[in-house]
Amino acid sequence: MRQWTSCGYQFNTSTERFGELRSSNDILKDGQALSERMKDDGYLFLRGVLDNDLVLEARHELLLKMAVNNQIDDDYLINEGIDPSLKTEVDQTSYREGRAVRQLAHQGEMTEFYETFFGKQVQAFDFIWVRIVGVGVSTGCHYDWVYMGRGSKSLHTSWTPLGDVSKVEGALAILHGSHKFSGLISTYGSIDVDDERTNQKYGGWYTQNPVEVQEKFGGRWLTTDFEMGDLVVFSMHTMHCSLDNNSPNNRIRLSLDTRYQPAGDETDERWVGESPIAHGAEAKRG
């Protein structure tokens, strides 16, 4: 089996430690079954459930803005999304507030799924995380709770690839069973990155090394070659990371991270409203 890495660290790719995500398309319309599988697995992988036209519109909208900001190589077609040799840092506010991005995240199949999953009306975070992952870049192992745990205990994340994302291009990886690691959840998994009283040791990521967490707590890393229209949903205490983007074509990986909870639940004030405060000075505690 090919060796895969995250943050430069190799995964243990033995069958006991590494494998493919399980599809939940067979129970897509059964809210109770979806809830039970989430409790069992900590994630739901859904093939082709999003409207490809909406995904393409969001992708194209982002790439056009990136082209204006010199974030893609202009020697190639815009839709190729090729990583430029010269990196440019850009304020992403206009990216996450784009019409097509918000339509994909807050309407249509996405909202319909969560209404089935929760069995009630849905509230989405207003803040949308646009992930622009260049070649040689990845995300370390972490729980989402540490970034957004001040509100609903039923909050979930959607990871949406904006186009096909193979393993070699930096696919998402889920650590199966990690939502049941009570020792990790009660320590690292209980911190707030904006609270000095709880976050004196860890920071946002637990580790860059995907094998480290397995050696301490167990679990099996799961990933796949994602296709346009796919969706992964997971809980706040599901450990995840991404594989390194080693695209042979220098292609940027584009994806969205969006969050959803039952309407009426308490919300994390950092991520809702017309201008969410995010991790700024107003969010600090302690």
What are these regions (language model features)?
Residues K120-Q123, R150, L162-A171, G177-H179:
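Active-site region of the double-stranded beta-helix
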Residues M1-S24, I72, L184-V193, L222, ...:
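Non-heme Fe(II)/2-oxoglutarate
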Residues L50-N52, V130-G134, V165, H179-K180, ...:
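Short, solvent-exposed loop/turn segments at secondary-structure junctions
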Residues D144-L155, G219, F226, R251:
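A short beta-loop-beta micro-motif enriched in histidine and acidic residues
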